[in-house]
């Protein structure tokens, strides 16, 4: 569960654009925010987490971005019954933004893993 909470927070807070930005091409993970959040997260929790939980924190971010992209797309295709929308293609826009974020996270996964290790050693 820790990965879900961490991943969802990063997915939402460390994206260069808002989750419903119409500019999906600008979506991506801000590694400075990722580093700062990870430092703040690990400082009080590292002692209570397993090595596997810590090692998979970056992957959890990717998983949550992928999960939300599928959920937004599914909601759009089903007529938007779950997520509140402000306009007809709102969930489609959200899905595209999350897909772009996930692609960027995948491209930066090694950097994210390195940041987690650096933050862990600084605790």
What are these regions (language model features)?
Residues 3-47, 63-82:
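Active-site activation/catalytic loop segments of kinase-like enzymes and analogous catalytic loops
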Residues 28-35, 55, 89, 93-96, ...:
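Generic alpha-helical secondary structure signal
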Residues 30, 50-51, 109, 113:
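General structural signal for secondary-structure boundaries
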Residues 49-61:
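All-alpha amphipathic helical-bundle segments outside canonical DNA-binding/catalytic cores
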Residues 67-123:
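ATP/Mg2+ or Mg2+-diphosphate-binding catalytic cores
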């Amino acid at each position: 569960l820790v990965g879900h909470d961490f991943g969802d927070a990063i997915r939402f807070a460390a994206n260069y654009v808002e989750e419903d930005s119409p500019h999906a091409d600008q979506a991506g993970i801000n590694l400075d925010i990722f580093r700062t959040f990870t430092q703040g997260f690990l400082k009080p929790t590292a002692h209570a987490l397993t090595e596997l939980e810590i090692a998979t924190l970056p992957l959890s971010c990717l998983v949550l971005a992928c999960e939300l992209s599928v959920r937004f797309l599914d909601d759009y295709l089903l007529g938007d019954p779950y997520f509140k929308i402000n306009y007809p293609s709102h969930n489609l826009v959200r899905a595209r933004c999350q897909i772009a974020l996930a692609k960027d996270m995948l491209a930066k996964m090694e950097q994210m893993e390195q940041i987690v290790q650096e933050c862990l050693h600084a605790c």
